[in-house]
């Protein structure tokens, strides 16, 4: 039976978040012929290096997001909220819900809810509610209701509190593409505050060992999704 094409939408707080934490899975699905959309709520511009202004770094990160997505044959959407100032209101929730209705993904990926970074926690709450708003036809918007599966919560060193890996995705076929695409994002290999590439590369190896694969990325799920319903053992 021919496999049905999937559409994966990863929604992060800043350019680089989903590209690092779920990028291997996105590359894996791209290699399988699936459709990829990466949404960033902000560029993540306030971590600007000394040689760039905040405004210049925002422009650079928007370009980096586009180049990363294009390497996967996907699309990038960077919203115009400000880094560190993402509002925890219904306005961004309905904005994301509208994107879900417009692009009709099968699966959502976002941040785990408990983070040291307020934008990450806020994005997680936004996506959970946006999934609900997008799927209920009683919320009348420009496009008809669409329910997307998930969300799956990506593993991020800044979102560690109570994170429990539950779903492991083999990224062996997408690993090299992911590594090449990450070279488009400046801070991944140039940050002096944290060794981003080394951390996430090593983490993919560790999760791969746990999954008995060469490389993997792991995701948490809502506790309600862990229920098993069987007729018998």
Annotate each predicted stretch with a short phrase.
Residues 1-102, 232:
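Active-site rim/loop-helix segments in enzyme catalytic domains that contact anionic ligands
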Residues 2-11, 87-233:
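Metal-dependent de-N-acetylase/amidase catalytic core
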């Amino acid at each position: 039976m021919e496999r049905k094409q999937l559409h994966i939408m990863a929604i992060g707080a800043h350019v680089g978040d989903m590209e690092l934490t779920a990028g291997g899975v996105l590359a894996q699905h791209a290699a399988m012929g699936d459709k990829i959309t990466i949404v960033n709520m902000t560029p993540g511009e306030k971590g600007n290096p000394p040689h760039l202004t905040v405004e210049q770094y925002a422009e650079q990160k928007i370009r980096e997001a586009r180049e990363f997505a294009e390497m996967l044959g996907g699309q990038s959407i960077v919203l115009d909220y400000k880094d560190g100032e993402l509002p925890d209101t219904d306005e961004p929730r309905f904005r994301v819900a509208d994107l879900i209705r417009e692009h009709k993904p099968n699966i959502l990926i976002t941040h785990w809810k408990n983070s040291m970074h307020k934008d990450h926690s806020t994005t997680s709450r936004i996506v959970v509610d946006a999934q609900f708003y997008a799927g209920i036809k009683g919320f009348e918007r420009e496009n008809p209701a669409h329910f997307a599966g998930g969300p799956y919560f990506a593993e991020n060193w800044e979102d560690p509190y109570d994170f429990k890996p539950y779903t492991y995705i083999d990224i062996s076929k997408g690993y090299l593409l992911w590594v090449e695409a990450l070279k488009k994002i400046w801070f991944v290999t140039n940050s002096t505050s944290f060794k981003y590439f080394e951390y996430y590369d090593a983490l993919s190896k560790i999760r791969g060992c746990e999954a008995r694969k060469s490389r993997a990325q792991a995701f948490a799920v809502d506790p309600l999704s862990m229920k098993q319903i069987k007729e018998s053992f």
